[in-house]
Amino acid sequence: VIAQMVALIVTVTPSIRNLPRFIFMMAGPLVTGLAFTIWLLFASRLRWQEKLALVIAGIAFPLIASQISDFDDALRTTMWIYGVPLAELMITLALSIWSQAPRRCLLAVLLLGLGWSSFALVRNEGFDGDYYAEFRWRWSPRHEDRLPELTPQSGVTPETSENADAPVNDLLWSQYRGPEGNGSSNEEIPPLDWSKNPPKELWRISIGPGWGSFSYNNQKLFTQEQRSEKEHITCYAAVDGSVIWTHADTTRFNEVVSGAGPRSTPSVVNGHVYALGGTGLLTCLNEVDGTVVWQKNLVSEFGAPIPMWGFSGSPLILEDKLIIFAGGPEKNGLLALECAAGNTLWGFPSTDMNYTTARPMTLCGQSVVVFCDGKGAHAIDPNDGSAVWTFKPELWKGPAMVDPQQIGPDSLIVGLGDGVGTARLEVSKTDDQWTVTEAWSSTKLRPSFNDCVVFDNGVYGFNQAIFSCIDATTGERKWQGGRYGFGQAMLLKKAGQILVAAENGDVVLLKATPEKLTELSRLPMLNDKTWNHPIVADNRLFLRNGKTAVCLQLVE
């Protein structure tokens, strides 16, 4: 029992890396359950009739609980994680309270029954970043059941459809993580003072589950969401949040930790919307009305397995190419497809689980696409998919969770794995020979799935659940202290400020300085688990999670 309690404590200790915590969470009940059963049967002083009764009860009550509970994968996992140690505790408690047979056995059976039947009262909607279960009363309505139909309200109007084929404004947010792919807004927004001029809420709507962000173009917002068995790519009017159009496919991705819904963010370029669903449907739509131009299934057409947490990388549009991770065999790993028709142009081998988006960079004067997988960081020639260089930092562990990010003419930072750390790479080229060196590796910034931003020689991001800043030159910690859970951040470059979407749904405004943590304001906003990246476009902050989307005007 003590060993099981230790395993549970390790599971929810944020300072420990996610993989060991996950192993303790799943293996702890198995190891301690077997040890407890062996002790009960062979080392305890119970009568054989009591041992038999407890074994029967220990098998029967979980089976009964599974029949009377709202028994899905999330609750099944919860019953394993919490039910086994609860059963051990109930038996130990009964034997400690009553030493006489058969009363001690009757009490143990009674407590076992009460413990296991309690799972019939709740359901589990997933886990947060610290692996705390999100329990809800079983009878409380599910969010998806309360969602209205996605019916176009505003239609296609001149305001929303004009200039759909015009070049995308490079100040706006037409692809995942913004115009430069680094979570930074270049808009002329002055420093914000929410104590004197708080943001004005323009609209708020209910939205389906999904962990992707918004993209923005021509006064329209594009995102992905789940509605029952339909996975939607939806276009909303930025002015009021009304539905302009939606495209639905009959597919549903769902997993225990984060629940249902797609994970990717659409890209909007040259009048088309490109989106990747959680089960691997890659779709090109007309930006104006949402009609299908082409669609590919990464699983059936490229032999790609669905990753544990679903397909999560967003389409990168580079001139006439769409670059996306599939993870299929041979050269069906990272793919380049024609934007116009979806035909395959090239492939780069990569079969590891991957949850990142490839990034275009210019290093040593050469245009490359940088992509991370279990083998390290790769620079790839976007013209033919050939490897320019590959480098694996010393602390590297897969799978890749956060995007690589260029921070200098010949330097970039990469995440080292889920909760492992961050490294800075320096790249040089002599004639045709490339050299990649590791300037530093830091365990002072250990992101899970949370991307960082860079400003004033500081790298700002999540050291697990604590917002932190490290020196971009040395990797040394500058400060740590923002308790924002496993959230996401973006940079208002002109204002020198950072907007953090905290995991609990709060919006936090920080001064972007490596000197110290300076929290300027914190506003409750979404009031639920929020893993989605915030975006800023046309003086408005757009934020969503798996239940709600909201629009805030930043400056009057």
Show the residue positions of the predicted features:
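Blade-level signature of beta-propeller repeat domains, shared across WD40, Kelch, NHL, RCC1
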Residues: V420, G505, N527-E556
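Aromatic (tryptophan-biased) beta-strands that constitute blades/sheets of beta-rich domains
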Residues: R138-S206, H232-T234, V239-E255, T291-A304, ...
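Membrane-embedded alpha-helical segments of integral membrane proteins
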Residues: V6-S99
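Loop/turn-rich, solvent-exposed surfaces of beta-rich toroidal or solenoidal domains
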Residues: V420-T422, S442-A512
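Extracytoplasmic beta-rich repeat domains
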Residues: K196, L202-S215, K230, T246-S267, ...
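Short loop/turn segments that connect beta-strands within beta-propeller blades
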Residues: A237-D240, N286-D289, E338-A341, D381-G385, ...
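Short coil/turn segments that connect the beta-strands within blades of beta-propeller domains
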Residues: N218-Q219, N270-G271, E319-D320, G365-S367, ...
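Internal/C-terminal transmembrane anchor helices
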Residues: Q100-G126
